[in-house]
Amino acid sequence: MPASMFSIDNILAARPRCKDAVLPVAPSAAAPVVFPALHGDSLYGAGGGTSSDYGAFYPRPVAPGGAGLPAAVGSSRLGYNSYFYGQLHVQAAPVGPACCGAVPPLGAQQCSCVPTPPGYEGPGSVLVSPVPHQMLPYMNVGTLSRTELQLLNQLHCRRKRRHRTIFTDEQLEALENLFQETKYPDVGTREQLARKVHLREEKVEVWFKNRRAKWRRQKRSSSEESENAEKWNKTSSKASPEKREEEGKSDLDSDS
């Protein structure tokens, strides 16, 4: 490397001025959040243009023991139509020229439902969770703001709805019979019933919780109906003597 590159004139000429300084942004068309199929090649390997294209924006994390990126995130990347997408490590170092002050970096944000691969820990970085494949062709990590990254993680970490268990008629009959005997069966009774109807004990426990809630609602509604009926009977009984008096007066008027 020529020594003239380290001269004071070259260093000062390469430094951007405050007025002309432009914040570095990721290329919009050259760096979408889609990785072509590498076929075993390293993402940061020397072959091809991958290292030169992404090296400035996605520094190479080193896993414990000297393992590179393929060993760290190779198992976390998902394949879809010859594309790999997974956990993207976006460098959030302070940007902007030194003379104007740097923008504070993003804190370490990580989706709690996605395991962190080795080599991806550390402050000053944001871990973007896997996103649906429908969004990949239209996304660019370099253009996402701090709020958008947080919303993306929240969208991915949204709790999925559990599958509802469908019970057969025989299972429902056995569960209902035990419920009529006792509203709060112990663990041994639940396990015995679970083996009998070919269910897990957790499913039986959840069914009893839901059945008790339904039973309490029915009991509450029936008590309210009985109270309303009593109130109606009282009002009707109070009104009946008055009606009799009115009927008697009407009879006397008709006789006269």
Swiss-Prot record:
Under the heading SMART domains, the entry gives:
HOX (SM00389)
- The annotated regions of Basic and acidic residues compositional bias extend over 240-256
- Identify the domain of life: Eukaryota
Q: What subcellular compartments does it reside in?
A: Nucleus
In this chain, the stretch annotated as Disordered covers: 213-256
List the keywords (alphabetical). Developmental protein, DNA-binding, Homeobox, Nucleus
Stated induction or repression of this protein's expression:
By activin.
Q: What is this protein called?
A: Homeobox protein goosecoid
* Organism of origin: Mus musculus
